[in-house]
């Protein structure tokens, strides 16, 4: 569906039809709002991602009632390896992680929004927009124009609406390199026989923390018959390595990781991965923008930086920020006021719901990168700690539990040796593990 009518007015213009934008459009359309859902791509389209959904996704009725549309597998076992390849092997009686493929998942979210009445304008990017006293005027790359009461930026890390808010609020115009994770991945069909034999009915999801000593992690997520394999690493680390090591590249790093998976038996030895099969993305992991609204403007999903700083998981935050944006607008449309102070209703909503989670997941990230072997060793000791570690990593652990557990571990002396090392500069020996 292409926009050819000039100056058509909508209640809300959503710039970006990924999970956050499509979800915002879905809920707004259900409310009876007129919605323009715009994206530069034509759907279905692929997106670089591990394709994992934490259990919080069960909050969305239109997701769990349509599992058959896109669900690939339910994960009931997670294995996390430390730098020394000691594993934390956690088995759950019920799924704690759901596997999808973004090609199908994102397309279905768009279809759900359109089915509720949203107008899809695909294959055309937003060129610019202007906020005035009574509307937002939007210009598209093909020359068409439209307007709305509010514009929602859902265009990812380099979103136009996000940049406008940053400019107004005197915030840095771009994410810092240390707040961007570069993710590379590929998907390959390994066949049902290999998948059932190696990854089992539990459809193991696996990660290698600080593979080859680099901050970040490598992963192998098992779908139905497809493996999703990738690596994620802060952009500043990648830039540093490229400048210091001649010939080093993130693609070579991923291919080296595949060889390790083959050696461990997690990847078929007879399948070769070509560099052309690899895709990448920049993921903001900086705990969210300090301000996510302006006059007649708001941002959702990656555009607002709503991604777990620990694992890079952003699908739940994408969907929930889209829903929270729609719920806030439903209140504001009854009053007809869309100034920044009115739209702060949305900013407060996401901040109070999971803003603390993002902050404590960042704490978890730093602990895991600074003292990975100690955390892995202690996490492997008992089932309760395994459960905590796994749920924290996949993003299903509330901030309060993360905070309380980490502080309790330090208070009990589990981590104090390495914490003291950081504080004093004196290397402390990690105590021997005891039952």
Where are these regions (language model features)?
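Glycine-rich FAD pyrophosphate-binding loop
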Residues: 29-48
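C-terminal helical "tail/cap" subdomain of flavin- and related membrane-associated enzymes
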Residues: 330-435
């Amino acid at each position: 569906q292409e926009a050819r009518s000039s100056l058509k007015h909508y209640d809300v213009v959503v710039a970006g039809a990924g999970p956050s934008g499509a979800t915002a459009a879905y809920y707004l359309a259900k409310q009876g709002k007129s919605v323009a859902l715009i994206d530069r791509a034509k759907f279905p389209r692929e997106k670089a991602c591990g394709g994992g959904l934490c259990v919080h996704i069960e909050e969305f009725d239109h997701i769990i009632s349509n599992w058959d549309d896109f669900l690939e597998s339910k994960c009931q076992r997670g294995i996390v390896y430390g730098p020394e390849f000691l594993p934390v092997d956690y088995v759950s009686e019920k799924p704690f992680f759901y596997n999808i493929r973004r090609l199908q998942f994102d397309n279905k979210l768009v279809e759900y929004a359109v089915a509720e009445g949203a107008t899809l304008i695909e294959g055309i990017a937003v060129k610019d927009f202007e906020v005035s006293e009574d509307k937002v005027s939007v210009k598209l790359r093909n020359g068409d124009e439209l307007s709305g009461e509010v514009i929602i930026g859902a265009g990812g890390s380099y979103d136009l609406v996000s940049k406008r808010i940053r400019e107004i609020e005197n915030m840095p115009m771009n994410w810092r390199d240390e707040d961007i994770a570069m993710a590379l991945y590929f998907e390959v069909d390994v066949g049902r026989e290999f998948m059932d034999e190696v990854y089992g009915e539990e459809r193991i999801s696996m990660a290698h923390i600080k593979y080859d000593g680099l901050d970040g992690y490598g992963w192998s997520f098992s779908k139905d018959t497809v493996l999703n394999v990738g690596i994620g690493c802060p952009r500043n680390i990648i830039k540093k390595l490229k400048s210091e090591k001649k010939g080093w590249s993130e693609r070579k790093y991923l291919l080296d990781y595949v060889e390790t998976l083959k050696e461990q038996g997690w990847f078929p030895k007879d399948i070769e991965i070509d560099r052309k099969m690899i895709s990448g993305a920049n993921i903001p992991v900086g705990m969210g923008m300090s301000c996510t609204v302006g006059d007649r403007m708001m941002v959702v999903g990656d555009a607002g930086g709503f991604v777990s700083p620990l694992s890079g998981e952003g699908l739940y935050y994408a969907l929930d920020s889209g829903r929270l944006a729609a719920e806030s607008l439903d209140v504001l449309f009854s009053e007809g006021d869309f100034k920044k102070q009115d739209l702060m209703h949305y900013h407060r909503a996401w901040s109070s719901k999971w803003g603390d989670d993002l902050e404590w997941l960042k704490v978890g990230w730093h602990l895991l990168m600074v003292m990975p072997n100690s955390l892995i060793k202690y996490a492997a000791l008992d089932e309760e700690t395994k459960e905590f570690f796994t749920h924290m990593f996949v993003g299903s652990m509330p901030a309060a539990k993360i905070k309380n557990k980490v502080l309790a571990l330090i208070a009990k002396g589990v981590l104090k040796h390495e914490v003291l090392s950081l504080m004093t500069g004196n290397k402390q020996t990690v105590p021997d593990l005891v039952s």
